[in-house]
Structure formats: C-alpha cells, structure tokens
C-alpha cells in the first residue's frame, strides 16, 4: 500500500460493533458468531500494521453496522491502537480530503477553503474522546449547532 500511495480506511468501529454483538447469545447464528468474534481483532491488527508501515490512513464513516452518529468513537479506537491524537484528527480532515482529491477546498483551516469546523470543550490532543462531545458545528460557513454555557 505504501509503495503505491494507497490509503487505508480501517473503520475499526465496524469491527468493534460486530465483535461485541457476537458475544450476545442469539444475535448471530452460531456459524457466523465464531467468525464475527474475530473481525474486531483482525481490523485492529491490520490497522497497527498500516500505522507501523507508515501507510496513509484516512477516516472511515460508512461502517453500515454501528449506530449512526457515533462516528467519533473511531478516533478513540485509532488512538487506542497507537495512533497519535493529532494524526487521528488529520485522518478525518486533510488525509480524507486528499484521498477524495478535494484538499484545495476542504481538510484544513485556511483562507479560501470551505469552513467546516467543530469545537469541543478541552483539548482533544489530551483526550481524543472529547470529539464525541461537540458543542459547535459549522459546515460550509453555516452554523448547525452552537451550545454555549
């Protein structure tokens, strides 16, 4: 992947969801349950391998199995597996913009770029889980969420 500049989009949260549900008796048929238990650890292992190999990593949001609106858990999973908090944030911003070929308009806070901003109380570099508790959301310069106080 590194040799070809290919991005890895792990979506660890999908594996976590499937592996966790595999522990709920009856959630999956027995034939599937055994295989489902292994998904989370396999994704984590491949993530660590990509991280250690300096493969470009972008943020996955389309797990299809976990609850919608819980995408920020992915930051926690990435950091738990050894990624630096700033690199986890970059995976969701500039790295994803580069993967999609839209980095001239998105992915970083710069004059002339589209204003997509979230804010949290505290420093996510100290506690990445803060990104699960946004109090301010701006997309394309329009405020969608602004909880003050």
Residue spans for each PLM region:
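Small/polar (Gly/Ser/Thr/Ala-rich) solvent-exposed segments
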Residues: 126
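Short, small/polar residue-rich loop motifs at catalytic or cofactor-binding pockets
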Residues: 130-132
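His/Asp/Glu-enriched, well-ordered alpha-helical/loop segment
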Residues: 28-31, 38-123
